[in-house]
Curated annotation (Swiss-Prot):
Organism the protein comes from: Rickettsia typhi (strain ATCC VR-144 / Wilmington)
Protein name: CDP-diacylglycerol--glycerol-3-phosphate 3-phosphatidyltransferase
Enzyme Commission code: 2.7.8.5
GO MF: CDP-diacylglycerol-glycerol-3-phosphate 3-phosphatidyltransferase activity
Family matches, as Gene3D superfamilies: 1.20.120.1760
Length: 178
């Protein structure tokens, strides 16, 4: 594994326990550092794919583990926020359920040689998920901004709505196999 995109994917996975640890320290500096690490990890999601495609560094490892790293990052942070910060369960559960279902559908579609390209709306969904989770990690406790948690939850609801809409394209691609 001698390429930068794969290292970025691995780094995204390895930073998850650090983000969780900083979150549970539960002071302003730890929250800020945790949110910063989450933002940096989220940015690597863009760069690993971009670099892999631009410099012809696409690998089987990257194809398999990039989406796993994304799901782990979003899933672990979402569960962490649910457990500790009283974040609304409904958008979190919608996001988590969609991610698991779409992962399974993508695997199935790959087996039957059907490709579903990632839409711009799906990219917006991912950005909004990451943005909302960043805000919620920082929260009012880390920022001193009283209503930051509410802003984060509103963005999370928007992301959950887009999650349902974008997940439909995968079900639509599978309908001939049901």
């Amino acid at each position: 594994m001698k390429n930068l995109p794969n290292y970025l994917t691995i780094a995204r996975i390895m930073v998850i326990p650090v983000i969780i640890l900083l979150f549970y320290i539960n002071n302003s500096l730890a929250r800020k550092l945790g949110a910063l690490l989450f933002v940096l990890a989220s940015i690597t999601d863009f760069f690993d794919g971009y670099i892999a495609r631009k410099y012809n560094l696409v690998t089987s490892f990257g194809k398999m583990f990039d989406p796993i790293a994304d799901k782990l990052l979003v899933g672990c942070v979402t569960i962490m926020l649910l457990k500790k910060d009283n974040v609304d369960e409904i958008p979190c559960l919608l996001i988590l359920a969609r991610e698991f279902l779409v992962s399974g559908l993508r695997e199935f579609l790959a087996l039957v040689k059907v490709s579903v390209p990632v839409s711009r709306l799906a990219k917006l969904k991912t950005f909004l998920q990451m943005f909302a989770l960043s805000i919620l990690i920082l929260g009012s406790k880390g920022s001193g901004i009283i209503y930051l948690d509410i802003v984060g939850e509103i963005i999370l609801w928007i992301a959950a709505f887009l999650t349902i809409i974008t997940g439909y394209s995968y079900f639509k691609a599978c309908k001939t196999y049901f």
